[in-house]
């Protein structure tokens, strides 16, 4: 068997937007992903379903697997012929022990590549308004590990660091903050030198404490800081309040859980991130074509006899045209049929097939679609509705009441999924998540399936429309509904919820 290959991939500091394009591309090809606890949840959500996962932990004072065993795992998986991605928080070569992981691979002749990551000593200060270099304040940057091996003294030359007059960044040093400050002062540093501790940079948990070397430990104890955090020492720290930008974004500091179908890239998540939110994506449902689509195939044989075709979801559009392709049919087969869609998302999906919707309801839900379209009918039309197996029956009933003949055909089923990597229930129980966004009643049901036993009365739910809100209300959630059933209006709702919080 041919040997596989290993990629050491830097996942960046936490914000998925700082994960590199090359890293993301390699991740999609992985057979096996060996990942750290410091890899951001946004990056973890991008791991493909087909990849096998190996969690090696590596948080402060708690390692799921020791380094020597991690090295062996990489070797063994590559020797099986796998494409192995070693996903590491930050950059693999900056205190990431990437060099140690390559030693064994190199010795055994296993091919490998290094994909650098955006590193926290630069990105985390940047997200806090601190430029690590500035020609008016310093001309050098020094990155130091604040971690010391058990039973050993620091081998840091604090006097030499002080004499550089550059910016100092200490990683993994919060537990030793007092020793670091004392060492710098003993090395001759001015006690009034600006200094900062930056917590969970680039995420919703971002927090900073700016003080001086002489007062930093006391100030951190007073305000409270959680790990991971970095220590920055230098005159540039005085610029933090002046240059702070991230915290000014409307959703900065909020962590939002977005539920979505697995097959769909979430526009909602992208827009929330642009507003500053940390987004946790939960593929809570998936759509699967029904095993026997014979009823749809029968409808295909008489497509030109329908006056209306109604699509109630983007998935319905996608599967309908996939089945047409399978039967080697094209849009000419639709004849003179008009097309109605339930909302903007479905309208856009239809446009991908070079078709424009003839009818969109004023409110994007099945009841309004049925009521408003019924007013357009003469009473003898033939209507085709290819949609989910558990579709809204009221839509069909409203149309049939006009005398129309409706072929309501289930073309796909909705199944509920559980995340492999993220414990959504724990995230909500610990208060890490500020709001959950639902874009359909199905995503509500998928979320509930994934979080059984959760106290739903504590869940703040932002819902896109009436049916989605009703589904969330049924579980006692604290629901709010967007003014319009659009993604843009839903984002505005989340902003309002944060302002009211």
Task: Report the location of each language-model feature.
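Structural motif
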Residues: 5-8, 31-33, 51-54, 82-86, ...
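Acidic, glycine-enriched active-site microenvironments
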Residues: 29, 103-104, 119, 123-126, ...
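Conserved anion/nucleotide-ligand pocket segment
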Residues: 151-196
């Amino acid at each position: 068997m041919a040997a596989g290959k290993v990629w050491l991939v830097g996942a960046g500091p936490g914000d998925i937007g700082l994960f590199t394009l090359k890293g993301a591309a390699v991740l999609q090809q992985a057979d096996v992903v060996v990942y750290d606890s410091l890899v951001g949840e946004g990056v973890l959500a991008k791991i493909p379903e087909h990849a096998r996962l190996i969690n090696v932990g590596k948080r402060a004072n708690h390692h799921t697997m020791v380094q020597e065993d991690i090295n062996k795992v990489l070797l063994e998986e590559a020797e099986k012929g796998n494409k192995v991605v070693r996903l590491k928080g930050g950059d693999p070569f900056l205190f990431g022990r990437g060099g140690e992981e390559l030693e064994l691979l190199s010795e055994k002749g296993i091919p490998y590549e290094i994909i650098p990551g955006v590193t926290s000593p630069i990105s985390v200060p940047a997200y806090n308004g601190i430029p690590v270099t500035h020609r008016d304040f310093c001309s050098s940057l020094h990155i130091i590990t604040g971690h010391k091996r058990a039973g050993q003294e620091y081998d840091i030359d604090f006097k030499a660091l002080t004499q550089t007059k550059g910016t100092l960044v200490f990683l993994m040093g919060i537990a030793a903050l007092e020793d670091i400050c004392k060492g710098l002062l003993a090395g001759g540093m001015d006690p009034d030198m600006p200094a900062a501790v930056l917590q969970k940079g680039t995420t919703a948990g971002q927090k900073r404490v700016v003080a001086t070397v002489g007062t930093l430990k006391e100030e951190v104890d007073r305000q409270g800081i959680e790990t991971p955090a970095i220590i920055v020492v230098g005159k540039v720290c005085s610029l933090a309040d002046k240059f702070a930008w991230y915290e000014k974004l409307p959703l900065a500091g909020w962590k939002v859980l977005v539920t979505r179908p697995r097959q769909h890239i979430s526009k909602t998540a992208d827009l929330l991130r642009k507003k500053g939110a940390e987004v946790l994506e939960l593929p809570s449902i998936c759509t699967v074509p029904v095993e026997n689509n014979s009823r749809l195939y029968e409808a295909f044989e008489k497509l030109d006899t329908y006056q209306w075709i109604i699509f109630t979801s983007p998935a319905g559009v996608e599967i309908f045209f996939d089945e047409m392709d399978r039967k080697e049919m094209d849009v000419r087969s639709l004849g003179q049929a008009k097309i109605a869609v339930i909302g903007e998302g479905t309208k856009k999906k239809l446009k991908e097939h070079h078709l424009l919707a003839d009818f969109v309801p004023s409110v994007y839900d099945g009841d309004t679609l049925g009521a408003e379209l019924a007013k357009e009918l003469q009473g003898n039309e033939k209507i085709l509705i290819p949609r989910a197996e558990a579709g809204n029956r009221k839509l069909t009933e409203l149309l049939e009441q006009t005398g129309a003949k409706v072929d309501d055909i289930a073309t796909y089923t909705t199944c509920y999924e559980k995340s492999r990597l993220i414990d959504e229930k724990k995230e909500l129980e610990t208060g890490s998540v500020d709001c959950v966004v639902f874009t359909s009643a199905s995503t509500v049901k998928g979320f509930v399936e994934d979080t059984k036993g959760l106290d739903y009365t504590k869940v703040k739910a932002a819902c896109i429309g009436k049916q989605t809100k009703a589904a969330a209300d049924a579980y006692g959630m604290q629901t709010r509904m967007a003014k319009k059933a659009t993604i843009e209006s839903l984002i505005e709702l989340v902003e309002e919820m944060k302002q009211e919080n």
